[in-house]
From Swiss-Prot:
GO-annotated cellular components: cytosolic large ribosomal subunit
Name of the protein described by the UniProt record: Large ribosomal subunit protein bL33
Keyword tags: Ribonucleoprotein, Ribosomal protein
Biological process, per Gene Ontology: translation
InterPro entries in alphabetical order: Ribosomal_bL33, Ribosomal_bL33_CS, Ribosomal_bL33_sf, Ribosomal_zn-bd
Length: 51
């Protein structure tokens, strides 16, 4: 079962990516380093719910 999630920047810029993940294989919250174009750096993105 794949659920849609938001990956929100921890830099505080408000930038986010949308993606999906398989909750059966990854029950914990996703954390991944990705590029934040607002500050032009790679930062940690954390999972949040899509409203």
């Amino acid at each position: 079962m794949r659920d849609k999630i938001r990956l929100v920047s921890t830099a505080g810029t408000g930038f986010f990516y949308t993606t999906d993940k398989n909750k059966r294989n990854m029950p914990e919250k996703m954390e991944i380093k990705k590029f934040d174009p607002k500050i032009r750096k790679h930062v940690l993105f954390k999972e949040a719910k899509i409203k």
